[in-house]
Design a protein with these regions (language model features):
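Short loop/turn motifs at secondary-structure junctions
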Residues: 8, 110-111, 171-174
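Alpha-helical recognition/docking segments in bacterial nutrient-uptake
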Residues: 56-165, 169
Length: 214
């Protein structure tokens, strides 16, 4: 009531602005937000969730917060979610078991959506399928093992072919393979893809040249 009076609008307008349901970002919305800030008012998301079944939260599960890819992903996702008046809930798990626990925990918090970056070698199909019918889930990278989950990733076969083709076009006659020490199906598949395209484009390689490790 005080926020509405200070902003000079109705209580219903205050509710729509602060809940994110009012599409316009105009002078009225700015007055409401300024009045709420001035009066120290904050939205009770738990109470709002009970009334609307919307928690205004997005869950993000990653293997590590220190990896460059994960750090960049956080830098991109958080401002976007903040712009949409959402809250980001982060779960970090370096193993399949840890990530499954984080996914379950976030789902039990009734997040409105879930973004998952699988850990190396993690098969989260069972866990993701368990919640995919009622929770929008997007998987970033990794193999698509859960058919009801959207996946944003790289066509690694096409990428490897483009790399080997480029080497061949530059007159390179041989190449070695260097990768991390991740022992996963994805790593083995990519290594096999490398050999396939090396043979296709007539480039030489040797098992003695291959290096794995940090």
């Amino acid at each position: 009531t005080n926020v509405a009076a200070t902003a000079g609008v109705s209580i219903a307008t205050v509710s729509r602005v602060l809940s994110g349901k009012r599409g316009k970002d105009d002078d009225i919305a700015r007055r409401v937000r300024e009045a709420a800030k001035q009066l120290g008012y904050s939205v009770n998301y738990a109470a709002s969730a009970l009334r609307s079944d919307v928690t205004k939260t997005i869950g993000l599960v990653i293997p590590s917060a220190t990896e460059p890819f994960a750090a960049q992903l956080l830098d991109e996702i958080e401002p976007t979610i903040d712009t949409e008046s959402q809250q980001l809930l982060l779960g970090i798990g370096a193993t399949q078991e840890a990530q499954a626990e984080r996914i379950e925990s976030l789902a039990n918090r009734h997040v409105d959506g879930l973004i998952v970056v699988p850990a190396a070698g993690a098969d989260l199909a069972g866990t993701l399928n368990q919640y995919a019918n009622t929770l929008p889930i997007v998987q970033i990278c990794g193999r698509q093992t859960a058919p009801r989950v959207s996946v944003v990733g790289i066509d690694e076969n096409a990428a490897m072919e483009a790399i080997v083709k480029h080497l061949a076009e530059q007159g390179i006659a041989s190449a070695a393979y260097m990768a991390g020490n991740e022992l996963s199906f994805e790593s083995a598949e990519l290594f096999a893809t490398f050999h396939t395209h090396m043979r296709t484009y007539g480039l030489a390689t040797s098992e003695n040249w291959n290096q794995f490790g940090e």
